[in-house]
Amino acid sequence: IYLIQMGLDSEQSFTIMESVRKGKGLKEEWKEEMRAHDVPEWYIDSCLKIKYMFPKAHAAAYVMMAWRIAYCKVYYPLAYYAAYFSIRATGFNYEIMCQGRERLTYFQKDYERRKDSLSKKEQDVYRDMKIVQEMYARGFDFTPIDIYRAKPDRFQIIDGKLMPALNTIDGMGDNAAIAVAEAAKDGKFLSRDDFRQRTKATKTVIDLMGDLGLLGDMPESNQLS
């Protein structure tokens, strides 16, 4: 900005200061141009001595990172983990990660044994396992998914615990999760058949939800025996 104020071309001013910032100094033609615009010698000498300057944009980015990762992680931990899992976690798996720390540790050790041969999806799961382990280590826990309260793709803080999003159920994609959340707004599901018809969820996903205890005592069909 100073060089622009002194009358140098804006593009040339940027090029000069990028060179100075990286410790590459000044070309002779730049020095001549600066002197032609009455840039003082002390300024030119300073540009020749600078080895590195931290850009403002980088400084701002580090401050924002410190706010998110340091301050929020320490003082608003559940909000931090809810945001992280909702936005950053691409391999979060409800069955593996939300059934207690012991179960997670079992799967994590298995992944570690196969670390060099993990698929891309498994690598994402393994990365998210570490964050979940950190959360458990800090004394926080998950609450089971409530199909009437859970969001399609957002974790929630419920009674001091995290409720995972519907799309963390293995096999339930984003569209299916949205369909479940929308169908739940229309009232209680009378049976698994009713759930299947209203949400279009696959039998595999419904069976998994049943095994995980997410469907409660929901009967198989509406028919009375």
Model-inferred region functions:
Residues 1-225:
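Noncatalytic, beta-rich nucleic-acid-contacting surfaces in large DNA/RNA-processing enzymes
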